[in-house]
Amino acid sequence: MEFDYVIVGAGSAGCVIANRLSARAGVSVALLEAGGADRSPWIHIPVGYFKTMGHPKTDWCYQTEPDAGLNWRSIAWPRGKVLGGSSSINGLLYVRGQPQDFDQWRQLGNDGWSWDDVLPYFKRAENWEGAAADERGVGGPLNVSENNVDRAIIDAWVEAAEQAGFRRTSDYNGEDQEGVGYFQMTMKNGRRCSSAAAYLKPCLLYTSPSPRDLSTSRMPSSA
């Protein structure tokens, strides 16, 4: 069995790479994943990360080295072991990163990594369901929605932050990330929008081969 490309790891990045490569006509791609398929309902139910984090079927269950800043404790370091990788077990929070950090990368000599360079790709990747803004994208594969949770204790926390001098923001991924507000989620119609859901599943729909097992201990998807 031969492929034009073999991608090791069907995590957040691997699913994107498989999607992009398999979009090219006549190209065959093998995507290898050490974990299993993302069939568990706990993966797709947003609150299900309480079940998937720390579970050996979906999490590598890493532990950090003891650290002086933690009083020499070792803590859990969840990493996804399933299609979609950590995007299938994380808390669904969507945060792009500070523009100043990207600009500093450029200042250090990394051409193509300034905020102005990467913003078009952030916009291309997302389907933002909130208010329109120049910094936000629509029509992309990764669905990003506003948090519609209404909890008095969170509202009180936000109000306390405002009283402490923080500015309330309705879109921390917009023009200015500094402030306090509800977080945004990678979710669509009440279901988690993981990298596998956003990039891999559509890829399998428009290519002819079906996912298949290449061994009893590995579950790759080929496109």
Whereabouts are the PLM-identified features?
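N-terminal glycine-rich phosphate/pyrophosphate-binding loop and immediately adjacent elements
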Residues: M1-K123
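Rossmann-like flavin
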Residues: N71-R192
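Amphipathic coiled-coil/heptad-repeat helices and related helical stalk/stem segments
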Residues: S195-A196
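Hydrophobic alpha-helical segments, chiefly the membrane-spanning helices
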Residues: S217-A223
